[in-house]
């Protein structure tokens, strides 16, 4: 009931759910359908993902907690986004509010660090997204600008790519490329103490594109 009220609230752009169990699947589905009609994303963090967590949720709520995989499948079916960490519930709300949902599952990942980029690629792939390598046209365009990248699913600019001018050009080209539906830019430790090398280019380029862009 509270969730449905928030969906109808004109001052609410995104609805966040902290779930222990789902007591009324029909009401949840109706709420999700109405939120979709109004263009309001719903994001959920669910307790009871492990077997012991399921038992704790049951004892705390007094309700039967369905199999975790079944709940996850139900949430996906009705269009409710799910996060795996509580902190991500807050972080994802900002992204969902500012950017429209992409129409596809193809995600390009660019990074200045192989380790950090690999971590993001793993998480996206586990979420069922397609991590796409740059196509020949993108590789050629960047090559003509003196920036060499390979056909790897992770566009790893390495330490050399922490130059602001290089990062800006690559981000602009990737956002403008039709080979992906969304982009994740990974700011690695190589730019941790020099925000101008990677963070500044992201802030400058992001407003110029309608393509969904997330930063890790």
Place the predicted regions along the sequence by residue.
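Catalytic-core regions of core metabolic enzymes
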Residues: 1-216
């Amino acid at each position: 009931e509270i969730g449905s009220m928030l969906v109808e609230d004109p001052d609410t752009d995104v609805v966040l759910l902290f779930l222990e169990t789902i007591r009324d699947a029909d009401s949840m589905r109706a709420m999700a359908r109405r939120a979709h009609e109004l263009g309001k994303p719903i994001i959920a963090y669910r307790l009871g993902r492990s077997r012991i967590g399921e038992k704790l949720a049951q004892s705390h709520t007094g309700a039967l907690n369905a199999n975790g995989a079944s709940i996850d499948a139900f949430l996906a079916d009705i269009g409710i986004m799910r996060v795996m960490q509580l902190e991500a519930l807050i972080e994802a709300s900002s992204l969902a509010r500012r950017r429209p949902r992409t129409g596809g599952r193809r995600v390009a990942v660019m990074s200045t660090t192989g380790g950090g980029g690999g971590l993001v690629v793993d998480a996206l792939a586990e979420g069922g997204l397609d991590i796409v390598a740059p196509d020949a046209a993108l590789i050629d365009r960047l090559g003509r600008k003196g920036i060499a990248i390979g056909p790897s699913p992770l566009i790893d600019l390495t330490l050399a790519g922490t130059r602001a001018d290089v990062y800006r050009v690559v981000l602009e080209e990737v956002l403008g490329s039709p080979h992906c539906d969304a982009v994740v830019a990974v700011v690695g430790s190589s730019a941790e103490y020099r925000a101008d090398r990677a963070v500044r280019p992201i802030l400058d380029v992001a407003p110029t594109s309608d393509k969904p862009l997330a930063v890790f």
